[in-house]
C-alpha cells in the first residue's frame, strides 16, 4: 500500500513513512 494506507501491513507503513514504531498511523 501507499503511505497512509491503513490496510497496509503495520511494518510496511512505518518503513514507508520513516517511523520506527507502528504508532505512526494508529495507536496500537
Swiss-Prot record:
Stated role: Insecticidal neurotoxin that reversibly inhibits the N-methyl-D-aspartate (NMDA)-subtype of ionotropic glutamate receptor (GRIN) and inhibits inactivation of insect sodium channels (Nav). In vivo, is highly toxic to insects.
This protein's name: U15-ctenitoxin-Co1a
Keywords: Disulfide bond, Ion channel impairing toxin, Ionotropic glutamate receptor inhibitor, Neurotoxin, Postsynaptic neurotoxin, Secreted, Toxin, Voltage-gated sodium channel impairing toxin
Highest rank taxon of the organism: Eukaryota
UniProt entry tagged with the keyword GTP-binding: no
Keyword Disulfide bond: yes
GO molecular function: sodium channel regulator activity; toxin activity
GO CC annotations, alphabetized: extracellular region; host cell postsynaptic membrane
Broad class of where this protein is predominantly found: secreted
Tissue spec: Expressed by the venom gland.
Subcellular location: Secreted
Homology family: Belongs to the neurotoxin 03 (Tx2) family. 05 subfamily.
Amino acid at each position: 500500500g501507499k503511505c497512509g494506507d491503513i490496510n497496509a501491513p503495520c511494518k510496511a507503513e512505518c518503513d514507508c513513512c520513516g517511523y520506527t514504531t507502528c504508532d505512526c498511523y494508529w495507536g496500537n
